[in-house]
Structures are given as C-alpha cells and as structure tokens.
C-alpha cells in the first residue's frame, strides 16, 4: 500500500514495502510555515500517538510534528540537518522527516485518505 494518508495536523504518511511508515508535512503545512530554516529530528525510540516527535522552525514560526500513531522511529532524514529547505522544495518527497514501525499496522488505514484531506483543506479555506 503506497497510498498516502493524512492527519488533521497536515502530516502525510506513506506505508513502505517493508511495513515502515514514512512521515512528512504536507505542501499546505510547509506553505503556511514559510521558509524552513531548521528541523529537529526525533530520536530513534518509541513514541506514543500525539507526542511531539520533531520540530520544524521557519522564518515565521516553530511548529511540532506529532507522532500520528504509536510506534518506534527507526530512521530519520539526515539530509534535513544540513538542508532544511528540502521541506519547502519537496515536502512530499525528499523533505520527509522520519520513518517508524507502527504498533498497529492497520491503524494507518483509519487516517484521512486524499479525498478526506482535500475536504479538510476546503473547510479550512472556507473558515
């Protein structure tokens, strides 16, 4: 399943072939932040759903990146340490933040699909 899933916090998730889940922030989120100047990546450890795993700082603000599901972070995108601008340049690709192994692999499917996320964005724009 390589279909993207999303959170209401504007994070995207992609299940990889090995069962790990890659996490990043959406184009909407990086646009709202503006130019990203620093990314604090998570430690390789277990995090509970909703806990702050990472921080992204921009010229406008600092924002937390929250663990979308309970699981163990197994890899971080070290490129972001030297090139945080990748979050702006390619938020859904090279600008990914971390990969984790979810405690419940099926829980990913309960997150927003593309249509549901698009409705969320429309509701935000209408508000």
UniProtKB/Swiss-Prot annotation:
UniProt keyword terms in alphabetical order: Lipoyl
The organism's place on the tree of life at top rank: Bacteria
Modified residues (N6-lipoyllysine): 60
Lipoyl-binding domain residues: 20-101
InterPro entries named in the record: Biotin_lipoyl, GCV_H, GCV_H/Fam206, GCV_H_sub, Single_hybrid_motif
Cofactor(s) this protein requires: (R)-lipoate
Gene3D superfamilies listed in its UniProt record: 2.40.50.100
Co-factor binding details: Binds 1 lipoyl cofactor covalently.
GO terms of biological process kind: glycine decarboxylation via glycine cleavage system
This protein's GO CC annotations: cytosol; glycine cleavage complex
Pfam families: GCV_H
Function: The glycine cleavage system catalyzes the degradation of glycine. The H protein shuttles the methylamine group of glycine from the P protein to the T protein.
Sequence similarity: Belongs to the GcvH family.
Subunit structure: The glycine cleavage system is composed of four proteins: P, T, L and H.
Official protein name in the record: Glycine cleavage system H protein 1
Species in which this protein is naturally found: Pseudomonas putida (strain ATCC 47054 / DSM 6125 / CFBP 8728 / NCIMB 11950 / KT2440)
Gene assigned in the entry: gcvH1
């Amino acid at each position: 399943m390589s279909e993207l899933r999303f959170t209401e916090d504007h994070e995207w998730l992609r299940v990889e072939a090995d069962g790990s889940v890659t996490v990043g922030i959406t184009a909407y989120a990086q646009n709202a932040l503006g130019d990203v100047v620093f990314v604090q990546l998570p430690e390789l450890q277990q995090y509970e759903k909703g806990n702050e795993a990472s921080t992204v700082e921009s010229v406008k603000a600092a924002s937390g990146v929250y663990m979308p599901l309970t699981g163990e972070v197994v890899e971080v995108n070290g490129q972001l340490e030297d090139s945080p601008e990748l979050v702006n340049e390619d938020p859904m690709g090279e600008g990914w933040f971390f990969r984790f192994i979810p405690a419940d692999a099926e829980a990913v499917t309960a997150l927003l699909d593309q249509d549901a996320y698009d409705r969320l964005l429309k509701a935000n724009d209408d508000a």
